[in-house]
């Protein structure tokens, strides 16, 4: 049975063959189009089973006529164009402060030469001007972005996460080719408990540098905090593949594996320990579905001292760890 797609192809072929008779100058080009359509759709315009009741041009004219008269279904979309001043102010916000006066002088020269006389082309001219200016100042722009990255690192270390985020945002605005900027912003998003955004930035970092191990391990940490242990282990394994001697990466992988095991198996009752509430029968799998608990457990398990206690089987010291007691103490109050 002939398909509508084949019938449409034949209608187009018939239209092109009529056009060849009316436009001898382009007949050769139209013939090439006819042959291509025949081959692609595997049809023959002489096949009676593929013919429709009216030629394509008539169907088209009827459709256009009906839509032009049916004003009740016509939707008009209006787009408000920005003025030259609005476009310039928007562009100024994307220029490093240190270079802003220089850019404004550049704009003034262009204005004097009449570059913005045509309102319809203002946006195109301004965008091209910005691109040309930033390219001419590439070295300075990269230096400014690097300075912002360093400021962001300092803010992150001080626990000023929103200020750090602002620094990394600007660094990326000025130089979006640097994988480190995205990876550092990913760390900031994780600190702000926005693990989905952290993963997005890790992926952006990996696009720019597929061999950047730290981007994979930060992505693994974000996945761990979301309880997506399979994805976390995959990310950590990739980081280790890139840096096989990195012990921190290996410890992070081991941590994700432990958390995955805990999530899949309900732990046995915990012994009573002075200072710790009765946790018998506590469902650790359910607990680990809580992002706050996962994040705290992730940090604790990444502590080298905690790892050493677990590896040595020193459960007494482990269970009397002040941080662990605090975590379980808080759980007992919930």
From Swiss-Prot:
TPR repeats: 145-178, 180-212, 213-246
Key word Repeat present: yes
Top-level taxon of the source organism: Eukaryota
Keyword vocabulary terms for this entry: Chaperone, Repeat, TPR repeat
Gene Ontology terms describing biological process: post-translational protein targeting to endoplasmic reticulum membrane
UniProt keyword Repeat, yes or no: yes
GO CC annotations on file: membrane; phagocytic vesicle; TRC complex
GO terms assigned for molecular function: molecular adaptor activity
Classification via SMART domains: TPR
Pfam families per the UniProt record, alphabetical: SGTA_dimer, TPR_1, TPR_8
Gene3D superfamilies from the UniProt entry: Immunoglobulin FC, subunit C (1.20.5.420), Tetratricopeptide repeat domain (1.25.40.10)
PROSITE patterns cross-referenced by the UniProt entry: TPR, TPR_REGION
InterPro entries: SGT, SGTA_dimer, TPR-like_helical_dom_sf, TPR_rpt
Function: May act as a co-chaperone and regulate the ATPase activity of heat shock proteins.
Alphabetical list of PANTHER family matching this protein: LD24721P (PTHR45831:SF2)
Protein family per UniProt: Belongs to the SGT family.
Protein's name in the database: Small glutamine-rich tetratricopeptide repeat-containing protein
């Amino acid at each position: 049975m002939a398909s509508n797609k084949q019938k449409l192809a034949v209608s187009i072929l018939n239209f092109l063959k009529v056009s060849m008779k009316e436009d001898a100058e382009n007949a050769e080009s139209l013939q090439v189009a006819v042959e291509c359509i025949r081959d692609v759709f595997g049809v023959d315009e002489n096949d009676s089973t593929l013919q429709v009741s009216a030629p394509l041009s008539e169907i088209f004219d009827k459709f256009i006529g009906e839509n032009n008269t049916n004003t009740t279904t016509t939707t008009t979309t209006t787009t408000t164009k920005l003025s030259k001043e609005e476009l310039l102010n928007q562009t100024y916000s994307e220029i490093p402060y240190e270079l802003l006066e220089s850019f404004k002088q550049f704009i003034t020269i262009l204005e004097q030469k009449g570059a913005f006389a045509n309102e319809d082309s203002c946006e195109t001219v301004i965008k091209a001007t910005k691109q040309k200016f930033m390219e001419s100042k590439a070295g300075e722009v990269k230096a400014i972005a690097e300075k912002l990255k360093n400021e962001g690192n300092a803010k992150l270390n001080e626990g000023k996460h929103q200020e750090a985020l602002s620094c990394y945002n600007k660094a990326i605005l000025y130089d979006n080719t640097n994988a480190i900027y995205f990876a550092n912003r990913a760390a900031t998003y994780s600190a702000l408990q926005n693990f989905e955004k952290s993963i997005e930035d890790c992926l952006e970092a990996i696009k720019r540098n597929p061999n950047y191990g730290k981007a994979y391990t930060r992505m693994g940490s974000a996945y761990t905090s979301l309880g997506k242990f399979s994805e976390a282990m995959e990310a950590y394994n990739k980081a280790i593949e890139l840096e096989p001697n990195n012990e921190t990466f290996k410890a992070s992988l081991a941590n994700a594996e432990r958390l995955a095991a805990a999530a899949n198996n309900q732990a046995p009752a915990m012994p009573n320990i002075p200072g710790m509430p009765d946790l018998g029968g506590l469902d650790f799998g359910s607990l680990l579905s809580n992002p706050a608990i996962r994040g705290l457990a992730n940090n604790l398990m990444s502590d080298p001292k905690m790892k050493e206690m677990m590896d040595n089987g020193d459960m007494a010291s482990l269970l009397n760890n002040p941080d662990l007691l605090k975590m379980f103490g808080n759980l007992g109050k919930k």
